[in-house]
């Protein structure tokens, strides 16, 4: 944990970096980012929202940024420890879907 440069992001370092460049200061860890923002339903998720993964709502281990338009299959951009920055489809995905705990909105209308 702790990577937050262009050469070595971890997931929450990546979300923190991207959001900072849009004027939002996120906490450092995935868990603290999830604890900070208002939860939303998956059906309300839109580009720019955060999606949190883990074994429970109190044990968040990964975060990504929704990169798909509302109404389309949900995808995220995120930092993978093994593959770097990537886009992954998380809807009906055998790896990601079971781990989704919640979505949260940082950028208000």
Residues covered by each model-derived region:
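Short, Lys/Arg- and Gly-enriched loop/turn segments at beta-strand edges
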Residues: 58-65
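Structural motif
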Residues: 48-49, 65
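Short linear Ser/Thr-Pro motifs
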Residues: 5, 12, 61, 80-81
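Short loop/turn positions at the edges of beta-strands in beta-sheet-rich folds
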Residues: 57-58, 70
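Short beta->alpha junction loops/turns
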Residues: 4, 56-57
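Aromatic- and glycine-rich peptidoglycan recognition patches
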Residues: 24, 38-40, 66-109
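Catalytic cysteine-centered active-site loop
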Residues: 1-47
């Amino acid at each position: 944990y702790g990577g937050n440069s262009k050469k070595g992001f971890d997931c929450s370092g990546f979300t923190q970096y991207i959001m900072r460049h849009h004027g939002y200061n996120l906490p450092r860890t995935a868990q603290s980012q999830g604890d900070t923002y208002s939860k939303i339903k998956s059906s309300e998720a839109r580009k720019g929202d955060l999606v949190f993964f883990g074994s429970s709502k109190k044990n968040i281990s990964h975060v990504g940024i929704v990169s798909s338009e509302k109404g389309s299959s949900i995808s995220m951009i995120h930092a993978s420890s093994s593959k770097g920055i990537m886009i992954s489809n998380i809807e009906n995905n055998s790896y990601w879907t079971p781990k989704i705990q919640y979505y949260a909105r940082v950028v208000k209308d």
